[in-house]
A protein has these predicted regions:
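Short acidic (Asp/Glu) patches
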Residues: 14-20, 57-69, 101-107
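C-terminal capping/extension of enzyme domains
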Residues: 1-16, 91-108, 137-200
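Internal catalytic-core helix/loop-beta-alpha segment
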Residues: 77-133
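Short, surface-exposed acidic-centric catalytic microdomains
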Residues: 48-98
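Short hydrophobic segments within beta-strands
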Residues: 32-35, 83, 122-123, 167
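Active-site and ligand/interface coordination hotspots across diverse enzymes
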Residues: 1-60, 158-160, 192-200
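Short, solvent-exposed loop/turn segments at secondary-structure junctions
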Residues: 37-40, 87-89, 125-128, 169-172
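Short glycine-/acidic-enriched loop or helix-start segments at secondary-structure transitions
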Residues: 42-45, 131-133, 176
Length: 200
């Protein structure tokens, strides 16, 4: 299945959105990592060029977690799909609530494409907000408590039978400088990978 084509069929007007143009067997995906927002240049996204800006921070995190990867395909082959909550590049420093809301229908449909997901990682506050907006529509409450990620790290959060792991943003060169967040995000990736391996 091509994710972009599938979402275009399901959602209709996707003209101004950046959707993942990647072929996947949805049944093989056991974990989804939701990053915050698509980059301004499509080539810098996870499924852009092999040495894209987003992969330049993602690969070191996986390796720190003890998962040897070199390309996004290596991550997909391990049953892990990466996407962005907001499908349009940000126009200012912060991601606006409106841009999160505009992308929600597409993110919701995208998540529903994968029937065997056991873990969803929320990489940063925008991903957490977007996921809570989705859960509020279906369950009338937030899936993830609105407290700092640091305080949630050792809390087991389950939503519709799926383990939810709030973590830190995985893109942008700052993450390589902020050693503590890099370490914690890598530990969270390690936890996610253990959970999907244990369920095999």
């Amino acid at each position: 299945m091509n994710i972009k084509s599938e979402l275009q069929q399901l959602c209709g007007d996707t003209q101004n959105l950046r959707l993942n143009d990647v072929n996947i067997e949805p049944e093989t995906i056991q974990a989804i990592m939701i990053n915050e927002v698509v980059p301004s240049c499509p080539e810098d996204d996870f499924y852009g060029k092999p040495d894209s800006a987003y992969m330049s921070t993602t690969i070191p995190m996986f390796r720190k977690a003890g998962i040897e990867v070199g390309l996004v395909q290596d991550i997909l082959n391990r049953g892990i799909y990466i996407t962005n909550a907001v499908k349009t590049p940000k126009s200012e420093y912060a991601v606006s609530k409106e841009s999160i809301e505009n992308s929600l229908p597409y993110l919701g449909k995208e998540l529903a494409l994968f029937p065997n997901v056991k873990v969803i990682m929320l990489m940063g506050d925008v991903a957490k907000k977007a996921f809570n907006m989705i859960s509020k529509k279906t369950t009338k409450k937030n899936a993830v408590p609105s407290i700092s990620t640091y305080k949630l790290r050792n809390t087991e959060i389950i939503y519709k039978g799926i383990r939810i792991i709030p973590s830190y943003i995985m893109t942008g060169q700052n993450i390589l400088i902020e050693k503590s967040k890099f370490e914690m995000a890598s530990e969270d990736i390690e936890t996610m990978y253990r959970l999907i391996k244990d369920s095999d």
